[in-house]
Amino acid sequence: MDASLITEIRKIVLQLSVSSNGSQSKEIEEIKKQVQVNVDDIRAANIKLDGLGRQIADISNSISTIESRLGEMDNRLVGISSQVTQLSNSVSQNTQSISSLGDRINAVEPRVDSLDTVTSNLTGRTSTLEADVGSLRTELAALTTRVTTEVTRLDGLINSGQNSIGELSTRLSNVETSMVTTAGRGLQKNGNTLNVIVGNGMWFNSSNQLQLDLSGQSKGVGFVGTGMVVKIDTNYFAYNSNGEITLVSQINELPSRVSTLESAKIDSVLPPLTVREASGVRTLSFGYDTSDFTIINSVLSLRSRLTLPTYRYPLELDTANNRVQVADRFGMRTGTWTGQLQYQHPQLSWRANVTLNLMKVDDWLVLSFSQMTTNSIMADGKFVINFVSGLSSGWQTGDTEPSSTIDPLSTTFAAVQFLNNGQRIDAFRIMGVSEWTDGELEIKNYGGTYTGHTQVYWAPWTIMYPCNVR
């Protein structure tokens, strides 16, 4: 490939790199095809040269054979050798030229590839530019449409404004022909407002109607609807169909009602009736001796002067039958108490569920304990029974209140057995009622025989105390 061809290729490449014509890719493809054809031609020439080299080698062998066989042909062979040498030199020069051409082609191929890459980039940029140009054309078309629309709308507004101005001119002419510029008698013009001059005795009502002002005039005259009328009290007066003032029916009946009252009037009263008047109120009253009579539930009753005797327990008055009898709660009455028996000591305390039998005999309350086994006790301490709850039906907490506060109220001996390691040791405890507070009864353990133990077996025992609460 000669220098002029390379120079021409470079010019074409430069023109393609600068040009933005969309046909550049086709021209590059044509160049690539032409280069490929040249490469193919060079390769075919190399193949032919290789064939010539082999033929020359064959000829050299033939010449050597001829030289060995034909000595007499030396001069001719020398001439042939010179020719062969020249041919060989020419072939070598051709080979070098072909090699140089191959190197130049190899150098051109990367540049052609680079040119292909640049061409691809140019193609992408050209496509982007074409897309941007298309978008600009679309926006320009939309803008053109909007401008056309706005121009049309402005034309419409201008036409409408011209019509409105024409209408305003016509209306202004009409106003000018009918406009009030001066006010006559009884009227006053204030700017664009025409006022009615109202003197004393006139006013505008809530409906903006001009009426007579009677507020400072005679009483009893006013307006009803659109007319002026005489004011009346409708409780006693009314207008008839002729507009005359008449009495209402209640007033018309007054004479007959007064006559009825006069016919039933009591002119005087006789004792024990009296008439009293206070603060304008007349009251008919019945006179009676308050020491003998009294008024109970608005009924005059005879006052009893008898003094009823008082009764002490066990007697009581049966007011229903007006008789004196022995109180129902006097005599013997039985019941039960079920709850927790509490043992209290500074060093020991426990609770046990028990049921006590109660018996009220005259003024004494008997507590009967059944046999039971409890936890251990100390040498003293106290047992507590709470009668606030647990009493059987018919018994009240107050029924257990002692009649005295002496400590102890009463005492008794309780037989017990102290249980210790399977042994039973007979003993007794001295028990006494010591205190009763708000339904809580305390039974003290005042002592007795005592020994170490783990449990206590209690034989049945009773204790009683005076209980004649009145």
Curated annotation (Swiss-Prot):
Undergoes dramatic conformational rearrangements during viral disassembly in the endocytic pathway. It is found in: Virion. Disulfide bonds: none annotated. SUPFAM superfamilies: Tropomyosin, Virus attachment protein globular domain. It holds the Pfam family Reo_sigma1. Residues 325-470 are annotated as: Head. The keyword Glycoprotein applies. Gene3D superfamilies: 1.20.5.340, Designed single chain three-helix bundle, reovirus attachment protein sigma1, domain 1, Virus attachment protein , globular domain. Keywords: Capsid protein, Coiled coil, Glycoprotein, Hemagglutinin, Host-virus interaction, Outer capsid protein, Viral attachment to host cell, Virion, Virus entry into host cell. Residues 1-324 are annotated as: Tail. The keyword Zinc does not apply. Residues 26-46 form a coiled coil. GO terms for cellular component: viral capsid; viral outer capsid. Glycans are attached at N21, N121, N205, N353. One of its GO terms (biological process) is cell adhesion. Homotrimer. Interacts (via the head region) with human F11R. Fiber-like molecule that attaches the virion to the host cell membrane by binding to the primary receptor F11R/JAM-A and to sialic acid containing proteins (coreceptor). The interaction of sigma-1 with F11R is required for NF-kB activation and apoptosis. Binding to both sialic acid and F11R is required to induce maximal levels of apoptosis. Belongs to the orthoreovirus sigma-1 protein family. This is Outer capsid protein sigma-1. It comes from Reovirus type 1 (strain Lang).
